[in-house]
């Protein structure tokens, strides 16, 4: 099928590049608040007046930020429009989401607190330039040989059968049990 062919081609997200302001704003937030190591910088090869910062997400992928020392942070919320990005989500561990919540609170960053989404916990906040960020942490481990997506796909089918609003713990537990029997 087309979807299974796509999963063979697309390994995972390579990187996200954001438009930033000055270098220090980006380093202070991405490294010092979220804990993503600042790994290097170089000129933006498409615009030599702009710098390009690289931060390690910890899994081999990066967040990169274009910076310009002539720009200052504008903390206004970005517009939520058709064709725009609503938010960027990072998959983190349960301990990381809790540490991040503490770091955000300790440094004056407004956030939602950790929200229970049924199959995962989420923490939402805005980075210094207004982009909505989500830290997402699954509350289950898939059986060996299966992915989180496999479990969620099966759990969704069970949720539909229950005529439920969203996937809950019982759907995840039943989905894992069903996958283990395959």
Could you tell me what each predicted segment is?
Residues 19-63:
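Core segments of cupin and vicinal oxygen chelate
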Residues 1-6, 10:
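Single conserved hydrophobic/aromatic residue that forms the stacking wall/gate
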Residues 49, 71-76:
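A short, acidic/glycine-rich surface segment
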Residues 7, 13-21, 54-58, 75-182, ...:
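Vicinal oxygen chelate
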Residues 67-70, 96:
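Membrane-helix exit/interface motif
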Residues 62-65, 134-135:
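Short glycine-/small-residue motifs
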């Amino acid at each position: 099928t087309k979807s299974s062919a796509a999963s063979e081609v697309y390994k995972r997200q390579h990187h996200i590049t954001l438009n930033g302001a000055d270098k220090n704003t980006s380093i202070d937030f991405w490294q010092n608040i979220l804990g993503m190591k600042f790994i290097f910088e170089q000129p933006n090869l498409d615009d030599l007046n702009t710098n390009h910062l690289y931060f390690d997400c910890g899994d081999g992928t990066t967040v990169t930020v274009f910076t310009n020392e002539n720009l200052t942070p504008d903390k206004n919320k970005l517009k939520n429009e058709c064709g725009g990005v609503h938010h960027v989500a990072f998959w983190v561990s349960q301990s990381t989401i809790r540490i991040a919540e503490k770091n955000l609170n300790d440094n004056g960053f407004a956030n939602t607190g950790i929200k229970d989404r049924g199959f995962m916990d989420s923490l939402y906040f805005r980075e210094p330039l207004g982009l909505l960020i989500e830290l997402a942490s699954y509350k289950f481990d898939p059986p060996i040989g299966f992915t989180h997506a496999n479990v969620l796909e099966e759990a969704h089918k069970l949720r539909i059968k229950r005529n439920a609003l969203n996937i809950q713990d019982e759907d995840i537990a039943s989905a894992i049990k069903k996958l283990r029997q395959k």
